[in-house]
């Protein structure tokens, strides 16, 4: 995806390009997390729970979601497993 920045300063143009790349990467990571959660909710199993929990932890580690949200999501998934 090409960036057509409004900025005139070279460093600001570079930052705009970086923001686009980081946004794509973060969106993909968050989407993978949501997909893992939906897969577990569709068919609750121990294996899918571990995959969803791992995806949530990765998103938390990368700063995509808050640690409290990660904990809450994992607790809700665990209650569906039990």
Curated annotation (Swiss-Prot):
Q: What's in the keyword line of the UniProt record?
A: Ribonucleoprotein, Ribosomal protein, RNA-binding, rRNA-binding
Tell me a Gene Ontology molecular-function term this record carries.
small ribosomal subunit rRNA binding
Gene3D superfamilies per UniProt: Ribosomal protein S20
What are the GO cellular component annotations?
A: cytosol; small ribosomal subunit
Q: Does the keyword Zinc apply?
A: no
Under the heading Pfam families, the entry gives: Ribosomal_S20p
Domain of life the protein comes from? Bacteria
GO process terms (BP): translation
Record bears the keyword RNA-binding? yes
InterPro entries in the cross-refs: Ribosomal_bS20, Ribosomal_bS20_sf
Family annotation (PANTHER family): 30S RIBOSOMAL PROTEIN S20 (PTHR33398), SMALL RIBOSOMAL SUBUNIT PROTEIN BS20C (PTHR33398:SF1)
Protein family (similarity comment): Belongs to the bacterial ribosomal protein bS20 family.
Q: What does this protein do?
A: Binds directly to 16S ribosomal RNA.
This protein's name: Small ribosomal subunit protein bS20
**Which species expresses this protein natively?**
Streptococcus suis (strain 05ZYH33)
Organism lineage reads as:
Bacteria, Bacillati, Bacillota, Bacilli, Lactobacillales
């Amino acid at each position: 995806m090409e960036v057509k920045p409004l900025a005139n300063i070279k460093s600001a143009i570079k930052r705009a390009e970086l923001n686009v790349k980081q946004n794509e990467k973060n969106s993909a990571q968050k989407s993978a997390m949501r997909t893992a959660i939906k897969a577990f909710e569709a068919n609750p199993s121990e294996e899918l729970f571990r995959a969803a929990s791992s995806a949530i932890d990765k998103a938390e580690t990368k700063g995509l979601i808050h640690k409290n949200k990660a904990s809450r999501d994992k607790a809700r998934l665990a209650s569906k497993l039990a």
